[in-house]
Amino acid sequence: MSILHATILTVFPEMFPGTLGHSLAGQALNKNIWSYDVINIRDFGLTKHKNIDDEAYGGGNGLIMRPDVLGSSIDHALALNPNAEMYYPSPRGRVFTQSFAKEMLKNKNLIFLCGRYEGIDERVIEEYNVKEISVGDYILSGGEIPTLTILDCLIRLLPGVLMNQNTLSSESFEEDGEFKGGLECSLYTRPEIWRDRAVPSVLLSGNHRLINEWKKEQSHMITKLRRPELLKDL
């Protein structure tokens, strides 16, 4: 049995596993560290045309995904994954962060409802206590790409996915990590000199105390310049 299971509701089932079938996530999928199933919302569509949307009450642009269609597809998903937490990628949602990812993993059974068109009927959110989640202040065509993004982040946190689990402690946004929730320092590798640009000499010194101090200073400087709001709790 896998550690994490995701049920994905979408009108484009062919988009999954997508990028999650490759690299670390793909290897973890093959090892059954995580698993998924996809439900095609259109299978629950109405009439011979499998309609899943309709015009908005009160007017406005765009079509709304119908609650009766979504309700039937969600009921099916819950039958497969009864104890799951349900998320709906939406620009109105709580912003997804590294700490939010860890919070999500307290429940290893997740359902992702991928919206399309103008959005979904609000009654669906109320009926199923759906949690809205945002990947940033911009608009995409649907919830599939945010779902792939969120799952990629979650999968990396699962035991056995990374060759060295300690890698997580030296990454950006890790509150208990090397950079205390700030951005990662600048990185360098061979060659020592490239196009007249040299690797900082401290990194070649072999003095681990000085190297660690340099990394922390770099992290603080970069965070202050690019994401100063991350420093408020540091």
Curated annotation (Swiss-Prot):
Q: Name one GO molecular function term.
A: tRNA (guanine(37)-N1)-methyltransferase activity
CC annotations in GO: cytosol
GO annotation (BP), single: tRNA N1-guanine methylation
Give UniProt keywords alphabetically: Cytoplasm, Methyltransferase, S-adenosyl-L-methionine, Transferase, tRNA processing
Q: Give the binding site residues for S-adenosyl-L-methionine.
A: G115, V135, G136, D137, Y138, I139, L140
Q: Which reaction does it catalyse?
A: guanosine(37) in tRNA + S-adenosyl-L-methionine = N(1)-methylguanosine(37) in tRNA + S-adenosyl-L-homocysteine + H(+)
Q: SUPFAM superfamilies this protein is in?
A: alpha/beta knot (SSF75217)
Where in or outside the cell? Cytoplasm
Checking Pfam families in the record gives:
tRNA_m1G_MT (PF01746)
Main enzyme class: transferase
The question of whether S-adenosyl-L-methionine is a record keyword is answered with: yes
EC numbers for this chain = 2.1.1.228
Record-linked NCBIfam families:
PRK00026.1, trmD
Which protein family is named in the record? Belongs to the RNA methyltransferase TrmD family.
Q: How does it assemble?
A: Homodimer.
Q: Which HAMAP family match?
A: TrmD
Q: What role is this protein assigned?
A: Specifically methylates guanosine-37 in various tRNAs.
This chain belongs to which protein, by name? tRNA (guanine-N(1)-)-methyltransferase
Q: Which organism is it from?
A: Rickettsia africae (strain ESF-5)
